[in-house]
Amino acid sequence: MKINNNYRLILAFAVHLMFSGCNSTDPGTPKPRTYPRIEFPERNYQLFNGCNFEFEYPDYAVIEKEKTYFDSVAPNDCWYNLFFKSFNGTLYLTYYPFSNNNEFEKLINDTYDLVSKHDVKASGRTEIPVKLKTAGGMLFKIEGNVASQTQFFLTDSTHNFIRGSLYFNNKVNIDSMQVIQEFIDSDIEHLIYSFKWTK
């Protein structure tokens, strides 16, 4: 009889341990990855007027003239970089004058070639035609873990052509960067739709 009572006691203790070890806050379960909270700046726009064009850009960004192109001098004085310092991103704006249809077609083809280089890692691409009073062009939205998700070109189709491409100076991670990408994309769209050729 004593063995039976000891057996019951051990069995009750084992059952108690099994159930007390199961709780809803299991420390062995990995928690989902989170990213730091991002403080977005207030949006106000200011006018840039230089070379043959003008546009509005956010006042939290800094615009500077591009002085070099790889290891040489920039091809002309109308190349600019729009720095989004708080997000470690840069919108590269490259302006090209042209004088004939062959040069114009080459600029368009070069733009499509540069956009297509992202196709290797892209999961998709949307091309949005842009029609303005003094300009027309195309806005490219490239999906996936690519180096540049937003690119565009604008032209008057007779003498002036500008190309823009947004790059971040960090490792591409679409999950952590998407909210920043969307925030800056709205400012790039504002830049595009406020754009005017002045000459």
Describe each region flagged by the PLM.
Residues 2-10:
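Bacterial N-terminal signal peptides that target proteins for export
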Residues 18-21:
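C-terminal motif of bacterial Sec signal peptides marking the signal peptidase cleavage site
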Residues 23-26:
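Bacterial signal peptide processing site
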Residues 28, 122-199:
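Short, well-structured beta-strand
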Residues 30-52:
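Post-signal peptide N-terminal segment of mature Sec-exported envelope proteins
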Residues 45, 49, 53, 99, ...:
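Extracytoplasmic/periplasmic, Sec-exported soluble proteins
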Residues 48-109:
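Secretory pathway targeting signatures of secreted, lumenal, and periplasmic proteins
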Residues 59-71, 115-129:
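Short secondary-structure junctions
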